[in-house]
Each structure stands twice: as structure tokens, then as C-alpha cells.
């Protein structure tokens, strides 16, 4: 095959390509080298053909380089002219106009930014070489050309001024571009700062949530430690608790059959039903309170409005302070407890002898109340965080009969009818009336109970301000009845309920009057400057005693103070029957105030059963009902008076 054949073959190959390519403008050919993002397959194919034509047959592009354009530029054997035009005029997304949002920013182009930056770099290099030191950042963009104003004012050369004007305008334009770049950088930094602020707020919220959880856990730790100290202090780690714990662990680890589990569940339900049944049966039983015919003869021996000492009842041999007592005078039953004595003793008030005892509490009994209406029962509250309802008739029978076992079932008989167990700390005050029981505890909670079912009706939460909750107030020492500074007063020092009305006295010195129907305080009586230890109210008046060495008499109708009685020592206990107020103010005798006659006097110092210092004897608790006054001393003696 000769050279002529080769040229002919080449012309045969190039001829159809020239139909498409020979007529294309040179500008379009130059653009094809940069089309990296073209999506049309035909467009990519045409670009490759253009590049191949320039390399293989450079002479074929001569006509194009001469600028021969026209209608023949779009003629070919593969597509019509309109289709070829659309293909060759295609613009990809990179060549689209900027959106309105970007256009509104009016940012400098890449080339403009490059020009402005290059001029700055050149000036910086020149200054660094000349001065040998770097200027401050504020001079970075203000390196202007040195313009001699005298030359400008004196020259008449239009060419020189034109060149100088161009230089100045160039610098102005560069400064404008630099300002735009800096503002854009500032906007970006503001956006970053806002994002960091948002992240900071989120982190602070997480930290706050973590602090809340940490506080709750710290409260749990404090509660657990207090409970451990409480158990260690009173040595309450009994064998019964150990056996129960061991039994619970065995039940968790064992794989008992479903039949056994059902049987245990049924037995537990039966136990609950038996407890509820016993409580219901207790109210159905006839309750004949112990009545002594000699009581009327004895009471008539002493005339009213005169103070007469009747007897002293020694509570125990250890001389511990009386912590709680109550009595029902018409039937002559007295119940009392002393410090670190877990057993409540029942006395015949007319003969001064013990007729029963109530074992069951695991720690000191702090408060108690005898039902004065229908049932011969007693409710006690203890440091073991439980309340117990006792059958006093049954306690007499067990104590006098000395037969703790039933004949048929051999079941242990206990005078405790029901346990109220919801508080998490020691019980400090209780009061019941009709079918409702209210209890206050060191855990800052007040529970309202239904006596017929033994279930809690509602919970009342006390809220103290930080200044009140953290203050250290004086409190009565249980082992000597004296007031010791530096100890913390009871959170709930006293309370009394009557129907739906409830009055509470707390360590912040505030008396709160509650409506049990809504479970909220309706009035606050503020006046005491220290913790309240006792209170009593009737239909018109409320009397309160406090650690601030005072007794205050309030008018419930106007919430105003009617009278204030000051003492030398803190008030540990008081009682009120509408006419007489009896006050134990850590003195040897009981202070009596007759409101009708406005008279004050003190009971004389009675003889006591234990040897000791007369000056160290203090009144720890007082109770007054129907002309009978009973007070408990810090040495364990109980005195009975008629007023």
C-alpha cells in the first residue's frame, strides 16, 4: 500500500469527522479540555473526537483557526443542526449563575481575591526586608503608596497624575476587597461562636442534670448512713432481721416451682387479710374501759381550783427521762415510756400499780395518745420509724394472766393490733381523732392514715427555706430533760388534728394550719423565733410552746397573738383545756396559767423516789385533762396532781 493510499485512507477517516468538527469555532475547541463534569455521553464523545483531531490531523483545524463559522458549523451526519447546537452549547452545573442568596453577598471573585492578596504579600515581603521586623496586625492592610501631595499640587503632567490615580484606585479596590474578606471571616467566626454557645448551653444542661442526679444520690447516701448509725446506736441488728435477710437471699437464688411460688403468694395474701381482719375485728369488739368506782370518791376529795399532790409513780430503776405519757382520767389508765426503754408500761392510775406492758418497738418511744372516746386503745410513735396501735384490754389480760399462748393454736398473742410503716425516720409527733391518724417524722413528711383500714390516705410534704432548715436550734435532751445548745430541734415538734383541721409546729418556728380535705396549708402563724415543741387548740384559741422560752396564745379567728408568756428556759411541753394552760419549762415544777382569772402559779416540788440533786430535776412532759395533771420528770418519776 503506497503513501497515496495512506493519505486517501486518512482522508476517508477524517472526512466524516470534518463534517462535524471542521466547522466548530476555536473557542469551543479550547473549552473541551476543561470539561470534567459533563454528563451527556454524546458531549463527552465529541470532546474526545475534537482532541483526537487536533493531535492526528492538525492541518484539519486550519479552517477553524481562520474563523470560518456559519450554518455549516452545526451540520453533520449524526444529528440535525438544532440538536448539535444544544449539545455544543450545553453548560453543566458548575457554569450555572450563582443563586440569589450567594449573589446578594457580593463577594469578590477568586481572581480579585488573589490580586488583593498578592499585592499584600509583596508589600509585606518588601517591608520585612527593609525593616527587618514585622509590623503589627492593624497595619497589615493599610500599606498605601507613598503619595507626595506637594507633587500632586505642583505637577501639570496629566500622564503622571493618571498613573498615580490608577495606583490609588487599585489600592482602594484592594482595600475594599480585603474588607469584604475580613467581614466574611468575621461572619464565619460569629457563626462558630454561636455554634459554640449553643454547644455550651447543651453541656451546661447536661451538667445540671448530672448535678441533680448527684444530689439525689448524695441524699440517698446520707439517708443510708443515718439509718446505719441509727441501727448501730440502738443495737437494732436483731436475729429476726438476719433471718429475714437470709430468707430473702435464699428465695432470690433458689429456683422454686410455680406451685410453691403460688402457695407462698396465697399464704402471704392470707397474712395480709388476717392483719386487716384483726384490725376490723378490734373495732367490732366491745371496749369496756377500765373503770374504778373509787375514782369518783378520790376526785371529790380534792376541791377544784386547788393544787393537791396525789402520788408518785416510779417508772423504772435507771432514772431515765420520761419521753411520752398519756392517760384517760375517767377510767384511770396511764401509759408511759422512758428513754431507751422499748417497752410501754400501763398503769392503774387510781392505785399507782403497773397492770400491763406493751413490748414491740425497737427503740425509744417519742409520742403516744390514748383514745378518749370509744376504744380502749393506744397509738405510739417510736424512733424505729413505726407507729403501733395497741389493745389496752388485751395487754391487761396478758400481763395479769401471764399466758402469752393461746390454748388451741399455740399462737403468740400480742396486744399490738396494727403497724403503720411508711416513715423513713423517727416519729416525733402524732395525733388522732375519730377515724383519722396523723403522724409527723424527722423525714419532713406528714402521713394521714385511715384507722379503720390501716392504710395511708395522703402524704403532706413540708418545705423549709434554707435559712430555717440549716439552722441549729436547741432541743430537749432525752436522757436528762435539759435543753442543750448545739443539738437539732425536731423537724416536726408537735401536731394536732380535729376532723379535717390540722395544726403543725415545726423547727422553723412557724405554725401551719392545714385543711386535710385538700392536703395544703391554708394559714401560717409566724411569731416564734425558735423551734416549736408543743401545741394545743380548741375552737377559738391555739396555744404553742417553743424553744424561744415563750408560750404564745393565738386567736384562730383573726390569726393574731392574744398573749405571750415568757419563761427563763425553753418550753419542753404544754397542755390546754380551754381554761387552764399547764407548761413544763425545764423547771422543777409545772407552771399553771388560768386564762379566765389571769392567774399564774407553779406546782410545788413533790418528793421523788430516787436520790439525786433537787436542782437537776426538770419537767420533761405534762398532760392535763378534766382537773387531773400528770407530769413526767427527767429522773423517771411521774407525778399525779389535781387542779
From Swiss-Prot:
Record has Membrane as a keyword: yes
Domain of life (superkingdom): Eukaryota
Keyword Repeat among record annotations: yes
Region (Sufficient for interaction with FIS1): 74-126
Main location: mitochondrion
Biased composition (Basic and acidic residues): 243-254
Locations listed in the record: Mitochondrion outer membrane
Stretch list, region Disordered: 243-262
Keywords: Coiled coil, Membrane, Mitochondrion, Mitochondrion outer membrane, Repeat, WD repeat
Any GO BP annotation: peroxisome fission
Function: Involved in mitochondrial fission. Has a partially redundant function to MDV1 in acting as an adapter protein, binding to FIS1 on the mitochondrial outer membrane and recruiting the dynamin-like GTPase DNM1 to form mitochondrial fission complexes. Plays a key role in determining the polarized localization of those DNM1 clusters that are not immediately involved in the mitochondrial fission process.
Subunit structure: Interacts with DNM1, FIS1 and MDV1, components of the mitochondrial fission machinery. Interacts via its WD repeats with DNM1. Interacts with CCR4 and NOT1, components of the CCR4-NOT complex. It is however not a component of the 1.0 MDa CCR4-NOT core complex, but appears to be part of a less characterized, 1.9 MDa CCR4-NOT complex. Interacts with DBF2, another likely component of the 1.9 MDa complex. Interacts with SRB9 and SRB10, components of the SRB8-11 complex.
Assigned protein family: Belongs to the WD repeat MDV1/CAF4 family.
Protein name: CCR4-associated factor 4
Amino acid at each position: 500500500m503506497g503513501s497515496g493510499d495512506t493519505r486517501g485512507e486518512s482522508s476517508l477517516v477524517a472526512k466524516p469527522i470534518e463534517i462535524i468538527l471542521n466547522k466548530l469555532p476555536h473557542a469551543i475547541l479550547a473549552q473541551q479540555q476543561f470539561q470534567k463534569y459533563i454528563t451527556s455521553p454524546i458531549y463527552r464523545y465529541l470532546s474526545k473526537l475534537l482532541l483526537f483531531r487536533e493531535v492526528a490531523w492538525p492541518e484539519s483545524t486550519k479552517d477553524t483557526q481562520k474563523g470560518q463559522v456559519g450554518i455549516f458549523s452545526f451540520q453533520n451526519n449524526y444529528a440535525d443542526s438544532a440538536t448539535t447546537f444544544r449539545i455544543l452549547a450545553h453548560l453543566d452545573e458548575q457554569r450555572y449563575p450563582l443563586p440569589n442568596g450567594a449573589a446578594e453577598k457580593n463577594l469578590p471573585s477568586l481572581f480579585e481575591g488573589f490580586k488583593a492578596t498578592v499585592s499584600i504579600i509583596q508589600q509585606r515581603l518588601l517591608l520585612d526586608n527593609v525593616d527587618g521586623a514585622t509590623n503589627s496586625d492593624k497595619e497589615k492592610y493599610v500599606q498605601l503608596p507613598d503619595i507626595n501631595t506637594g507633587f500632586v499640587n505642583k505637577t501639570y503632567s496629566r500622564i503622571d497624575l493618571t498613573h498615580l490615580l490608577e495606583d490609588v484606585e487599585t489600592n482602594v479596590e484592594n482595600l475594599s476587597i480585603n474588607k469584604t474578606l475580613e467581614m466574611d471571616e468575621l461572619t464565619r467566626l460569629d457563626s462558630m461562636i454561636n455554634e459554640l454557645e449553643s454547644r455550651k448551653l447543651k453541656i451546661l444542661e447536661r451538667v445540671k442534670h448530672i448535678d441533680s442526679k448527684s444530689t439525689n444520690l448524695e441524699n440517698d447516701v446520707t439517708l443510708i448512713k443515718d439509718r446505719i448509725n441509727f441501727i448501730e446506736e440502738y443495737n437494732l441488728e436483731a436475729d429476726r432481721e438476719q433471718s429475714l435477710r437470709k430468707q430473702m437471699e435464699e428465695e432470690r437464688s433458689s429456683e422454686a416451682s410455680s406451685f410453691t411460688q403460688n402457695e407462698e403468694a396465697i399464704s402471704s395474701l392470707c397474712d395480709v387479710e388476717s392483719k386487716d381482719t384483726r384490725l376490723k375485728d378490734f373495732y367490732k369488739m366491745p371496749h369496756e374501759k377500765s373503770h374504778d368506782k373509787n375514782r369518783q370518791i378520790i376526785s371529790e376529795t380534792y376541791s377544784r381550783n386547788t393544787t393537791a399532790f396525789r402520788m408518785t409513780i416510779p417508772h423504772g430503776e435507771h432514772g431515765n427521762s420520761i419521753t411520752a405519757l398519756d392517760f384517760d382520767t375517767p377510767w384511770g389508765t396511764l401509759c408511759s415510756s422512758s428513754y431507751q426503754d422499748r417497752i410501754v408500761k400501763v398503769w392503774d392510775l387510781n392505785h399507782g400499780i403497773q397492770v400491763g406492758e406493751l413490748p414491740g418497738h425497737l427503740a425509744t418511744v417519742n409520742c403516744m395518745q390514748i383514745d378518749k372516746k370509744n376504744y380502749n386503745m393506744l397509738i405510739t410513735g417510736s424512733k424505729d420509724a413505726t407507729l403501733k396501735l395497741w389493745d389496752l384490754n388485751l395487754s391487761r389480760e396478758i400481763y395479769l394472766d401471764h399466758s402469752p399462748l393461746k390454748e388451741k393454736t399455740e399462737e403468740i398473742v400480742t396486744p399490738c393490733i396494727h403497724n403503720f410503716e411508711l416513715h423513713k425516720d423517727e416519729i416525733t409527733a402524732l395525733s388522732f381523732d375519730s377515724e383519722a391518724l396523723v403522724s409527723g417524722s424527722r423525714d419532713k413528711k406528714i402521713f394521714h392514715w385511715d384507722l379503720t383500714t390501716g392504710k395511708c390516705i395522703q402524704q403532706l410534704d413540708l418545705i423549709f427555706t434554707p435559712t430555717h432548715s440549716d439552722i441549729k436550734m436547741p432541743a430537749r435532751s432525752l436522757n436528762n430533760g435539759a435543753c442543750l445548745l448545739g443539738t437539732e430541734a425536731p423537724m416536726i415538734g408537735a401536731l394536732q388534728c380535729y376532723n379535717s383541721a390540722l395544726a403543725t409546729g415545726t423547727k422553723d418556728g412557724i405554725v401551719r394550719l392545714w385543711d386535710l380535705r385538700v392536703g395544703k396549708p391554708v394559714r401560717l402563724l409566724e411569731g416564734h423565733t425558735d423551734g416549736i415543741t408543743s401545741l394545743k387548740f380548741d375552737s377559738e384559741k391555739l396555744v404553742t410552746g417553743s424553744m424561744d422560752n415563750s408560750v404564745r396564745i393565738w386567736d384562730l379567728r383573726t390569726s393574731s397573738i392574744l398573749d405571750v408568756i415568757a419563761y427563763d428556759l425553753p418550753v419542753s411541753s404544754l397542755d390546754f383545756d380551754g381554761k387552764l394552760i399547764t407548761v413544763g419549762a425545764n423547771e422543777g415544777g409545772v407552771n399553771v396559767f388560768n386564762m379566765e382569772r389571769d392567774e399564774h402559779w407553779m406546782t410545788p416540788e413533790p418528793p421523788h423516789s430516787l436520790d439525786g440533786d433537787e436542782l437537776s430535776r426538770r419537767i420533761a412532759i405534762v398532760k392535763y385533762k378534766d382537773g387531773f395533771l400528770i407530769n413526767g420528770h427527767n429522773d423517771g418519776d411521774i407525778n399525779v396532781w389535781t387542779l
